Amino acid sequence: MGLEARGLQKSFWQRRVVDDVSLVINPGEVVGLLGPNGAGKTTTFYMVVGLLPPDRGRILLDGDDITDLPMYRRSRRGIGYLPQESSVFRKLTVEENLLAILETLDLTARERGERLTGLLRELSLEGLAKQRAYTLSGGERRRLEITRALISSPSFLLLDEPFTGIDPIAIAEIQGIVSRLKQKSIGVLITDHNVRETLEITDRSY
């Protein structure tokens, strides 16, 4: 069982940009979706995420057809998404950014506090907890974004260009985080123009 795309097709203005693409992401597996500009990788990625509907083909999650489910319902089914664009609240602190998501869950104040402490520790954000998001470096912000995406305890995490705009040290940190996600049996799909950095951590790539 896992996250699967079968026979995806997509055309824009009578030009087919994705033609019969299939892929599978298993739990605890890191998969790359790579290719040059114009190869259709971003379009394929967006169809898996739920940002674009396919013209043909299906998206399956653990054997269930989720092709027609909107993005928020896919999230409830365990598919997390980290967009390339910054998704943090810039004027809030790191811990306030996390609490903003935690408060949408059915948790007591004590449970929220415990989850917050665990999340800050897990991705080494304790020292940044009181810092406002707009003061973070690119790598620190990316760590915060991944932490926010993990709050809903996804089974699969889809990362759009996670290595773009960050320095080599931050890239190594993100690679380490992805490896830890794999150890927790979270399936990860990465699309990125940084082919070498992506191939260093993927089990296989399309």
Regions found by a protein language model. Give the residues of each.
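The feature captures the beta-strand-to-loop junction immediately N-terminal to the Walker
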Residues: 34-36
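Helix-to-loop junction immediately C-terminal to a conserved catalytic motif
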Residues: 49
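Catalytic Walker B motif of ABC-type/P-loop ATPase nucleotide-binding domains
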Residues: 157-161
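Conserved ABC ATPase "signature" region
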Residues: 99, 110-128, 175-179
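Conserved ABC ATPase signature
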Residues: 132-136, 140
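Conserved catalytic motifs of ABC-family nucleotide-binding domains
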Residues: 153
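ABC ATPase NBD coupling module
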Residues: 65-80, 85, 90, 109-113
